Regions:
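Phosphate/NTP-binding elements of NTP-utilizing enzymes
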Residues: 1-197
Length: 197
């Protein structure tokens, strides 16, 4: 759970790239709508696959005749990636999936008719894998009605701690510790809570 435009989609792309290059697995990416899934595949995923040398040769371009790949389904050695919209979950059915990635959880459909909750359906696809990975990201919408807020409350709520480069104090990053000279935000830097360096 985090604010808008803070790298959540890039996190998902990095997970996809890692698994294509180093730990091939069946991957499912759930976007709020089919249209958003198509846009994500064309605008973000395809660019990453094209521009990353370690991935470029593993996933054939969907335009090549023998690739078997489409905008919404791509095959690579040892795995595949399927991109779906939460508003059309039929393509999730009957596929065992080890890596489930849900983008913008709070904007996903709550129900897809007789299929039920599409996000719950996606999560169930990973039930047979002991080493499954389920990642849900979203900017929260309505307080106390947000699915990502609820998921966060049910989680371990772990935070990322980093050491200060000067004194070694372990701390979480907080916006109040970011400072810059007046009218020079490009010179912003982080001040340690302990030693202020």
């Amino acid at each position: 759970m985090s604010g808008s435009q803070l790298g959540k989609t890039d996190l998902l792309l990095n997970i996809v790239g890692y698994h294509i290059a180093h730990d091939p697995s069946p991957i499912l990416v759930v976007q709020p709508t089919l249209e958003m899934g198509q846009a994500w595949s064309k605008d973000r995923l395809s660019n990453m696959l094209r521009d990353t040398p370690s991935l470029r040769d593993k996933v054939a371009d969907p335009r090549s005749r023998d690739s078997g790949n489409t905008t919404m389904h791509k095959i690579f050695p040892g795995g595949h990636i399927t991109i779906v919209g939460s508003n059309s979950p039929a393509s999730m059915a009957s596929r065992p999936i080890r890596i489930v990635l849900v983008d913008e959880l709070d904007r996903c459909a709550l129900s897809a008719g007789a299929e039920g909750d599409p996000v719950a359906l996606a999560r169930r696809r990973s039930a047979t894998f002991w080493n499954r990975k389920i990642v849900q990201v979203s900017s929260p919408t309505l307080k106390n009605f947000s699915r990502i807020e609820d998921a966060y409350k049910r989680s371990t709520r772990k935070t990322f701690w980093i050491p200060c480069h000067s004194c070694g104090e372990m701390q979480t990053l907080e916006w109040s510790q970011v400072r810059w000279p007046e009218n020079e935000p490009e010179n912003a830097h982080y001040h340690c809570k302990e030693c202020d360096s």
